[in-house]
């Protein structure tokens, strides 16, 4: 009898310590696919790890975790192996079939972290693992945007995925278009999915395109900004720049991180007016998940 109890205890312990993703009952929800990748997440795995109580008594999640799955074509596997710098471990992309990842999300700062990643071959054997990846902010150029939106929507139901997948004219807000003396046309748009209001500062990502007189794109700026809507000032917090002669490079802020005044004769002033109007008309959206 004691032997049976001991064996039962071993079995229970084994089941208890099985990784979450090893469970046969895992139901993966499809998010998106292209020629390289297919992305899934498991709604039942979404867990609120931390939350705070605001001054008005609301409980707001500030840390959420969930499991995701990515499957790879040959091209996707090759790209992933190169990006992770593991060619010495996986020289043949055919040996990478899919990966499972535990993601940690902070909705207030729109950030995501890979807590754990396990990479598998077609025989469901782990070929490489990685833990505690860097924390990164999610924007329109992020590979993980679908994951972020699905996980946050599972908790808050604010329509992150719908806005992410909306037509361009619904997701992107045109701020201004300007033609300079050389005949270059510059257009600036704001990604409404990234907008969040912190006090009087609107945090957002903007996409600026410059085309020459022939209509050829010669420069693209992708910028994270903080715009003080009350004072009429702004600062570039992060960004990248692309030119027709160089690939993407880090965008350096000419003001060394200081806020600059937006003057009434600047093209950006028209953008400031549009941002103020957008915030006024979409207060629930820009204040979603806010702790203020």
What are the functions of these language-model segments?
Residues 1-9:
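Bacterial N-terminal signal peptides that target proteins for export
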